[in-house]
Amino acid sequence: MSEKHLFTSESVSEGHPDKVADQISDAILDAILAQDPHAHVACETVVYTGTVNVFGEISTSAYVDIAHVVRETIKKIGYTDSENGFDYKSVGVHVSLVEQSSDIAQGVNEAEEVRDKNGQLVDPLDLIGAGDQGMMFGFATNETAEYMPLAISLSHKLVKKLADLRKSGEISYLRPDAKSQVTVEYDNNGKAKRVDTVVISTQHAAAATNEEIHDDVINKVIKAIIPAELLDDETKYFINPTGRFVIGGPQGDSGLTGRKIIVDTYGGYAPHGGGAFSGKDATKVDRSASYAARYVAKNIVAAGLADKAQIQLSYAIGVATPTSINVETFGTGKVSDDELLAAIRKVFDLRPAGIIQMLDLLRPIYGQTASYGHFGRTDIELPWEQTDKANELKAMLEK
């Protein structure tokens, strides 16, 4: 008997310690951008029992009450009771923020392309150099309506459903910390066939019984989210498999900004360049170029030019023009990858300033991305999720 073709992805809830840290970092970023759209921000957060540490480098004219932003973010997530060992009222907030390095700033504020012109007129979109070197990936597939791999899409929706049920009071014993994991079986043609395994661990009140947790999660979460045709008698369910999950959140484990980069992106289905997103303004190509790469990939697939598309971008610090652009369609392209690459260069400006202008990234829009994924979101409007370039790409390649 042949082996099944299985692929697994996971997600975590907004109350997971690492996601608490991400949301704090992005809430601070948004608060600064609301006053100073051109601020340079690299804000990191550590959370643990009773304590939040905020540190990093920020250059801005804005004044933000960091401690207030931290407490409001924790409150919004749902850590409102001291019995959780971490709540917005009593948490200690320690802030250590300094100005961005002048060595980095000189390359971001004036790209190499500008410095090499010796005072001559230059393209305004050459003004901003990449905030660091590195490579970034974007991916899209027609496997789901949101152009995301099925396993990560379902994983996000499961933990989001848990949060919705908790916040509405429908399941009153739920607490903020939770994780999900979904294993999808594929057929020999690479098409998603069924859900093989679902794992959900959710923090709960001490009074909740294992039986009621199991029944509620199966009936009100899993069956409400995963289409019935993907579940069968062979699907395996693991609900709080350790037995109990009362101690959770930052009381149970420390959290750090940028430690859930696979959850943030494609659930391991596509490569990751290694750079985290949260707490970084758009001059940091770790973030903005990853968004641009997703935008390119999604428009390719939405145009019907490929069933799957993967884009790699790379940059040198202080240089505006990407050092490389790579396209891979895994044999599903309706035109060659070389033709796609030529069209991408004409349709998308992938210099940092070009990306910022194209996606309007100087706005305080980042806090909403810090939980439940940066891509494939249908509950919020994100500029890199638009498919407004699909027709232009298609028309160019049909000539």
From Swiss-Prot:
Gene3D superfamilies: 3.30.300.10. Its cofactor is Mg(2+); K(+). K(+) binds at residue 44. Keywords: ATP-binding, Cytoplasm, Magnesium, Metal-binding, Nucleotide-binding, One-carbon metabolism, Potassium, Transferase. The keyword Metal-binding applies. One of its GO terms (molecular function) is ATP binding. Mg(2+) binds at residue 18. It is found in: Cytoplasm. Belongs to the AdoMet synthase family. NCBIfam families: metK (TIGR01034). This is S-adenosylmethionine synthase. It comes from Lactococcus lactis subsp. cremoris (strain SK11).
